[in-house]
Design a protein with these regions (language model features):
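Bacterial N-terminal signal peptides that target proteins for export
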Residues: 1-6
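Alpha-helical transmembrane segments
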Residues: 8-11
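C-terminal motif of bacterial Sec signal peptides marking the signal peptidase cleavage site
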Residues: 13-16
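Extracytoplasmic copper-binding redox domains, predominantly the cupredoxin/blue-copper superfamily
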Residues: 18-155
Length: 155
């Protein structure tokens, strides 16, 4: 009888130890799964466009044409001859692009019209995240008569 009790205790002891190891294994698997989370997405590429001019007879985007990948951010920088802004012709963007541009343009003065940049080195970012591929034609509202136009091709 004594052997039966000791044998029974030994079996329960082994079972208890075995269940602890199983718990440790499942905890290790849970930690490994948590550590295997995907890496955060790389930040969007930022492409700079200078806004220049003498304030009276010439004004330009530099460069006036550029190609960017979908998801890029175009940073418009007032270098000289401001105030400047960036506006896009709603009838000169790809089909479905108006809503994507509205999402990518914060603090607008109107549909697809960014704010005035009045100070040197002031900038305004336009995100092309979710924007369909194609040509986006834009202009600077105060200097459109001086030919300040830009074409951005999104690939």
């Amino acid at each position: 009888m004594r052997w039966t009790v000791l044998s029974t205790l030994a079996v329960f002891g082994v079972a208890a130890c075995g269940s602890e190891k199983k718990g440790d294994a499942s905890q290790t698997a849970a930690v490994a799964t948590a550590n295997a989370a995907p890496a955060p997405a790389a930040p969007a590429a930022v492409v700079e466009v200078k806004m220049t001019g003498d304030g009276t007879s010439k004004a330009a985007f530099e460069p006036a044409t550029l190609t960017v990948k979908a998801g890029s951010v175009v940073r418009f920088i007032n270098v000289s001859g401001g105030p400047h802004d960036i506006a896009f012709y709603t009838d000169s963007v790809p089909k479905g692009a108006v809503d994507a541009l509205k999402k990518g343009m914060a603090n607008t003065m109107g549909d697809l019209v960014g704010p005035f940049l009045t100070q040197p080195n002031e900038h305004y970012d336009v995100s092309f995240a979710g924007a369909p591929a194609g040509k986006y034609r834009g202009y600077c509202l105060p200097h459109v008569a001086l030919g300040m136009h830009i074409t951005i091709t999104v690939q």
